[in-house]
Design a protein with these regions (language model features):
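Short conserved loop adjoining the S-adenosyl-L-methionine
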Residues: 125-130
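Short alpha-helix
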Residues: 188-196
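Class I SAM-dependent methyltransferase SAM/SAH-binding core
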Residues: 79, 84-114, 119-124
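A short glycine-rich, Lys/Arg-flanked "PGG" loop and its adjoining helix->strand segment in the class I
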Residues: 148-162
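A short SAM/SAH-binding and catalytic strip from SAM-dependent methyltransferases
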Residues: 134-146
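Conserved class I S-adenosyl-L-methionine
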Residues: 1-65, 163-187
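Class I SAM-dependent methyltransferase "Motif I" SAM/SAH-binding loop
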Residues: 74-78
């Protein structure tokens, strides 16, 4: 790539995709909270297999950087949270859903983790009282209208390391079959290239 090659404005592209989403969850905090309340009420703590793979890669990195404190935003059902609690002296979670926070804290207590804290807030509105060795967000960026600000917040809040990740699902075989017959399908509307 030449210096004169213009890079796309990832933040503008990302914001346009978030704004164009037909899902009311993207734009209405009450609907998002209701979704998580319903989802968490049926959930049992069990980390996803993909989280195991990510953590196998991250554990040595976290040890190498001597991570003792972590802040995770958007913990979902805690696929990463309790592993972070096992590795760190303290883990703080930030989420707009109190139901999510209660679920993660309960799962932690059931596994005798006493080093978890929770902050009921949207990441965009959260004002941390201190910094953390690690700021961690995984699969939680879907509502971030200003991704550049989100990443800048992570950087300001981290002393040593930021981890921002997003799983990219494997395309189902029927999607290619649809394309082969001329059908239109929008599977990957947030291109991870703009996220990296």
């Amino acid at each position: 790539m030449n210096e004169s090659d213009a890079l796309p404005d990832f933040n503008r592209i990302w914001a346009a995709r978030v704004a164009a989403s037909p899902s009311p969850r993207m734009h209405d905090d009450g609907i998002e909270r209701a979704f998580w309340r319903d989802f968490i009420s049926r959930k049992v703590y069990k980390p996803e297999s993909s989280a195991r793979q990510v953590l196998a890669y991250l554990r040595p990195l976290l040890r190498e950087h001597q991570i003792e404190t972590a802040l995770e935003f958007g913990p979902g059902w805690g696929s990463y949270t309790l592993d972070l609690a096992a590795l760190c002296r303290e883990v703080a979670c930030v989420d707009l859903s109190q139901d999510v926070l209660d679920f993660v804290l309960r799962a932690g207590r059931e596994r005798v983790f006493c080093n978890l804290r929770a902050f009921h807030s949207k990441w965009e509105d959260f004002s941390p009282e201190r910094t953390y060795d690690l700021v961690f967000g995984y699969n939680c960026f879907y509502r971030q209208g200003d991704l550049a600000d989100c990443l800048a917040r992570m950087t300001r809040t981290a002393n040593k390391l930021c981890v921002a990740g997003m799983n990219v699902a494997v395309l189902p075989p029927w999607l290619q079959e649809m394309k082969d017959v001329g059908a239109s399908a929008n599977w990957d509307w947030k291109d991870p290239v703009y996220f990296v």
